[in-house]
């Protein structure tokens, strides 16, 4: 249940991965179907140590999802740029303007109307999680329903939410990659989760997704008065981009260290009231960061 399983996955992809062309034009080495299991019960959180992971960015992203927002402006205000490439690409394609990412983000911050027009990602994660538009005209808050079920009927096998709204995929900047989250409560009150990720960028995306999923599980357990159990991650198309192969080999050569600990320092009444300051991470001792370009 340690970082070694991530490194084994990397090794398997490098050794056995199918060479594939993809929509980004970069190309990948890909395996189909993978699983990892992480024990969160002792306060450990799966933040990789074989390279430094900017875990606060991943937690800020999860808090943004939970807010229901779909505009990058709140992220950019916090110094989070992980979603800026997609609206920037749309802006450049539609206007012909050759702004840098830094210049684009500066305009997002300085101009409310510009941010409203060009900073929105469409009906992505937060919209589907908190305001799913049903065919009956009703709006469904999947997160609120999940928390209520965790409290009132913890033995339910229907405790899940997802973002794959087929009717709105065409309007999303990027269809959901981490798309289904399912939850399970043991008879002794431990919350387990299973995340299904249809598409996993193993070098850049997956380390963030693991942090986000663990942070979400901690918040849900806190809201429902439960202890933490296992986080199970499953992937569909699990891939390494060709321009990340050297970085992955460098990471494989490093010896993993113990995962850090996560403690929630405050216990708000609502899942939308958590702040980044509520997440105390201790004992994180990673190897140096390894850089890699995002495939858009």
Swiss-Prot record:
Gene3D superfamilies xrefs: Thymidylate synthase/dCMP hydroxymethylase domain (3.30.572.10)
Alphabetized SUPFAM superfamilies for the sequence: Thymidylate synthase/dCMP hydroxymethylase
Entry keyword Transferase: yes
Enzyme Commission numbers on file: 2.1.1.45
Database matches in PROSITE patterns: THYMIDYLATE_SYNTHASE
Active site: 177
GO biological process, alphabetically ordered: dTMP biosynthetic process; dTTP biosynthetic process; methylation
GO molecular function, one term: thymidylate synthase activity
Binding site for dUMP: 23, 157-158, 198-201, 209, 239-241
Superkingdom field: Bacteria
Alphabetical keyword list: Cytoplasm, Methyltransferase, Nucleotide biosynthesis, Transferase
InterPro entries attached to this UniProt entry: Thymidate_synth/dCMP_Mease, Thymidate_synth/dCMP_Mease_dom, Thymidate_synth/dCMP_Mease_sf, Thymidylate_synthase, Thymidylate_synthase_AS
First-tier enzyme category under EC: transferase
Record's subunit section: Homodimer.
Function: Catalyzes the reductive methylation of 2'-deoxyuridine-5'-monophosphate (dUMP) to 2'-deoxythymidine-5'-monophosphate (dTMP) while utilizing 5,10-methylenetetrahydrofolate (mTHF) as the methyl donor and reductant in the reaction, yielding dihydrofolate (DHF) as a by-product. This enzymatic reaction provides an intracellular de novo source of dTMP, an essential precursor for DNA biosynthesis.
Name of the featured protein: Thymidylate synthase
């Amino acid at each position: 249940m340690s970082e070694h399983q991530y490194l084994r996955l990397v090794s398997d992809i490098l050794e056995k991965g199918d060479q594939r062309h993809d929509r980004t034009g970069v190309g990948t080495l890909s395996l189909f179907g993978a699983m990892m299991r992480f024990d969160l019960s002792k306060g450990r959180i799966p933040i990789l140590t074989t390279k430094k992971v900017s875990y606060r960015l991943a937690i800020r992203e999860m808090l943004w999802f939970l807010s229901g927002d779909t505009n990058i402006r709140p992220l950019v205000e916090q110094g989070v740029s992980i979603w800026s490439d997609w609206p920037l690409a749309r802006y450049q394609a539609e206007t012909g303007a050759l702004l840098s990412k830094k210049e684009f983000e500066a305009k997002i911050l300085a101009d409310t109307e510009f941010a409203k027009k060009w900073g929105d990602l469409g009906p992505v994660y937060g919209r589907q999680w908190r305001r799913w538009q049903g065919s009956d005209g009703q709006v469904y808050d999947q997160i609120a329903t999940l928390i209520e079920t965790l409290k009132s009927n913890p033995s339910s096998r229907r405790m899940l939410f997802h973002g794959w709204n087929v009717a709105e995929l065409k309007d999303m900047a990027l269809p959901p990659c981490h798309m289904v989250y399912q939850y399970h409560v043991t008879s002794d009150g431990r919350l387990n989760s299973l995340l299904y990720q249809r598409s996993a960028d193993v070098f850049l995306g997956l380390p963030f997704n693991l942090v986000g999923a663990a942070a979400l599980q901690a918040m849900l357990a806190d809201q429902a008065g439960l202890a933490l159990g296992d986080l199970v991650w499953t992937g569909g198309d699990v891939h390494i981009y060709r321009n990340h192969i050297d970085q992955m080999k460098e990471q494989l050569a490093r010896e993993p260290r113990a995962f850090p600990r996560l403690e929630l320092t405050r216990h708000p009444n609502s899942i939308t009231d958590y702040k980044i300051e509520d997440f105390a991470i201790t004992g994180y001792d990673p190897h140096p960061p390894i850089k890699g370009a995002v495939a858009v």
